[in-house]
From Swiss-Prot:
Organism: Mycolicibacterium gilvum (strain PYR-GCK) (Mycobacterium gilvum (strain PYR-GCK))
Domain of life: Bacteria
Keyword annotations: Ribonucleoprotein, Ribosomal protein, RNA-binding, rRNA-binding
Name recorded for this polypeptide: Large ribosomal subunit protein uL6
Family to which the UniProt record says this protein belongs: Belongs to the universal ribosomal protein uL6 family.
Pfam families named in the record: Ribosomal_L6
Subunit structure: Part of the 50S ribosomal subunit.
Job description of the protein: This protein binds to the 23S rRNA, and is important in its secondary structure. It is located near the subunit interface in the base of the L7/L12 stalk, and near the tRNA binding site of the peptidyltransferase center.
């Protein structure tokens, strides 16, 4: 049995979980999230009120979906209680970010500024012109928008200029040596 999948998902106080067939809806202090669980996987509540994920048999696909479904449900519970935040940094001369309403405007050395719109449920916060954070209750949405922003100007291995996650280490390369 999946080591992750067999663990029940604890439901903290103040969180309401509704299970109807393959649909799991989690409502908490920060909002509501829903998830459609893949077909062979079954979701139920145990006597303690925790969420239990089970699979019908040990086929390879079912084993894979078992742990995945349990983790996605745990992410929903964490999202509606604590939320998710990703911090990012910008390195490079003249590179900066400015908040324009709920959107971000980047100056990244291109001939034009790059505008990123905040998707529903995601908020941006600019601490300094080179540091900003992305917050939301949906882990997948926060991670995807962070990856899209990072892709605007990936960090250069020679000079280290670009956008990166806070604390991310960039492998540096040695440049050409002159004669």
């Amino acid at each position: 049995m999946s080591r992750i999948g067999k663990q029940p998902v604890p439901v903290p106080a103040g969180v309401d979980v509704t299970i109807s067939g393959q649909n799991v809806s989690v409502k908490g202090p920060k909002g509501t999230l829903t998830l459609d669980v893949a077909e062979p996987i079954e979701v139920s509540r145990n006597d303690d009120g925790a969420i239990v994920v089970t699979r019908p048999n040990d086929e390879r696909r079912n084993r894979s979906l078992h742990g995945l479904s349990r983790t996605l449900i745990a992410n929903l519970v964490t999202g509606v209680t604590e939320g998710y935040t990703t911090k990012m940094e910008i390195f490079g001369v003249g590179y900066r970010v400015v908040a324009k309403g709920s959107n971000l405007e980047f100056a990244l050395g291109y001939s034009h500024p790059v505008l990123i719109n905040a998707p529903e449920g995601v908020t941006f916060a600019v601490e300094t012109p080179t540091k900003f954070s992305i917050s939301g209750i949906d882990k997948q949405a926060v991670g995807q928008i962070a990856a899209n922003i990072r892709r605007l100007r990936k960090s250069d291995p020679y000079k280290g200029k670009g956008i990166r996650y806070e604390g991310e280490q960039i492998r540096r390369k040695v440049g050409k040596t002159g004669k």
